[in-house]
């Protein structure tokens, strides 16, 4: 966005990702502000009478929406633009909290699939100084996670996105061929079997294709109200542009 780095503000999460976030911000010379969401989330869960020991979707989304509220309020306070980090793959799969990370003032990555994000980060890493490169490559080596659940007993990330919804390289493949060419389930499966022969079994492809179709259909309501963002490639899910779909469309006929 051609903004001076010193005028950009970043807010962090925890542990390995926390260390990388802090070191990357220092390396890039951007402003750093650390705000804890713990007390606010505990207060909110008390207000709605939710037991904070129950690590369910309410527990997770409370954190996601509190993060977003802080970011919006900080943007208002400083008269700045809240730039969203969500990408095309997350939007397709609905892997975002409605009115949490789903929302921003401008979705700069909204038409960039997750697999391309990785290539872009790797490219920037190799174009950067050694310190920044080291940090970015470690970020690429970190499991994809919203980090809304506590870490495991070793302090490692326990909530891994691809363990829950499947490999992004498969989902991005399904997404491109479904939206760009309108292929049905049978053809998507045949193409994936050819493209990923030796990487995924037929049963794995079938399993994750069913997950993709179901999540894509039931997540349309999130895509019907998203912030503005650029169209980068040949596939876009903006309801104001390339993609129009009723939010109550059923996946059941398509998945047969």
What kind of feature is each model-predicted range?
Residues 14-58, 64, 90, 135-146:
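A conserved beta-strand->alpha-helix junction
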Residues 21, 71, 174:
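Aromatic/hydrophobic pocket-lining residues that form π-stacking "cages" and hydrophobic walls in ligand
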Residues 8, 23-31, 40-48, 65, ...:
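Generic, well-ordered alpha-helical scaffold segments in large soluble proteins
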């Amino acid at each position: 966005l051609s903004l001076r780095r010193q005028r950009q503000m970043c807010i962090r999460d925890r542990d390995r990702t926390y260390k990388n976030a802090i070191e990357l911000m220092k390396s890039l010379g951007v402003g750093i502000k650390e705000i804890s969401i713990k007390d606010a989330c505990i207060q909110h869960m008390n207000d709605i009478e939710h037991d904070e020991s129950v690590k369910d979707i309410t527990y997770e989304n409370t954190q996601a929406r509190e993060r977003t509220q802080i970011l919006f309020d900080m943007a208002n306070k400083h008269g700045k633009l809240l730039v969203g980090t969500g990408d095309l793959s997350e939007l397709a799969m609905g892997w975002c909290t409605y009115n949490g990370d789903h929302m921003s003032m401008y979705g700069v990555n909204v038409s960039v699939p997750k697999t391309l994000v990785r290539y872009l980060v790797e490219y920037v890493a190799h174009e950067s100084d050694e310190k920044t490169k080291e940090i970015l490559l470690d970020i690429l080596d970190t499991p994809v996670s919203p980090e809304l659940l506590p870490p495991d007993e070793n302090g490692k990330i326990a909530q891994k996105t691809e363990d829950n919804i499947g490999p992004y390289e498969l989902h991005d493949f399904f997404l491109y061929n479904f939206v760009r060419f309108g292929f049905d389930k049978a053809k998507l499966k045949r193409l994936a079997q050819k493209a990923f022969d030796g990487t995924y079994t037929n049963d794995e492809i079938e399993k994750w294709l069913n997950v993709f179709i179901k999540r894509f259909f039931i997540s349309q309501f999130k895509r019907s109200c998203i912030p503005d963002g650029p169209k980068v490639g040949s596939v876009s899910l903006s309801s104001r542009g390339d993609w129009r779909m009723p939010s109550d469309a059923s996946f059941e006929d398509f998945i047969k």
